[in-house]
Amino acid sequence: MENAVLTNRLKIGELAHLSGLSVKTIRYYEDIGLLTPTVERSSSGYRLFQSQVLNRLAFIKRAQSLGLSLQEIKPLLALHDRGELPCPEVKEQLQKKISAIAAEMEALKTQQAELQSILKVWQEQPPSRQLNQSICPNIIK
């Protein structure tokens, strides 16, 4: 009877193979509550996952590739679990990521300009070989 009921269930190794994730990652996702509605245990103690968990793992992987953290993904999955489509919240998260990337790019441009300025001065005034108080006087403002 148990085998008939479990035919639509995947062991963790099978799920890892099909999803492209490691067993360790899947266990971690289960531990932090990302897979809770889709996990059962067999009578012998094996984790058994509903085949729909593959869609859930694909969503997690894609959301991470777009820059969302697991902490940001978890509430989106909770909305889905309550029967809601989380697309508006996903859109909001992606817009926040775009803003954060823009701010980071500005900071990197500023850092790049500072590095170029230091290297320009470096060429004009090579460091002396004499030791002094500064570890490298060329990078001191």
What are these regions (language model features)?
Residues 1-78:
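Basic helix-turn-helix/winged-helix DNA-binding cores
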Residues 1-6, 84-141:
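C-terminal regulatory/oligomerization modules of transcriptional regulators
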